[in-house]
């Protein structure tokens, strides 16, 4: 009986030790990510980055995204709904992280469409046709024009602008900033410079709500 009690106590102690170690590890990961983001705050937002929402919003939501990323597509309407539910409170800043093969051409098309005042329309059109644009995680770039037709874009100008060194520089800078911030997957969110404690839309909503409440103090 005594040996059984000792065994149970030892097992309980081992379990508690494991749980404590896991919690400490998770907290350390979050602290390191926050310190990294704070130390590299200038890498979070660039003056050229596409933005949506109130320029003076108390919450700045930075999203590193890949237009060929399925999870990015799933999050896009959810983020817009969250912004609509908090009018004037959230400013969305999009940063490019074209990790899929050929996705840099989608980004170039978005930036070229932006020059014609059609960035958000082009983004939604490409996201809507994402399944037809990418096969086996590789973007079929020759299909881009088909799905941008009908937006009122000058496609000849768009194709020419896609080859612009300025657009190439935007992509290169965003990828460099993603590397600085150790972004390795998409979407990656920062709420007023803070990374999510763990990935998920509920976690994103909670952190945004927390920052909105702080702004009221």
Predicted regions and their residues:
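C-terminal cap of thioredoxin/glutaredoxin-like
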Residues: 1-24, 145-217
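Ser/Thr/Pro/Gly-rich low-complexity linker/stalk segments immediately outside membranes or between
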Residues: 27-42
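A short beta-strand-turn-helix
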Residues: 42-59, 84
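Short secondary-structure boundary/capping elements
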Residues: 43-44, 74, 170
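A generic local structural motif
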Residues: 46-50, 78-80, 175-177
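Short clusters of hydrophobic/aromatic residues that line enzyme substrate/ligand-binding pockets
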Residues: 50-52, 133, 196
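Conserved strand-loop elements at the edges of beta-sheets that form or border functional pockets
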Residues: 54, 63, 198
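Structural alpha/beta surface segment adjacent to cysteine/selenocysteine redox centers
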Residues: 57, 62-68, 73-149, 154, ...
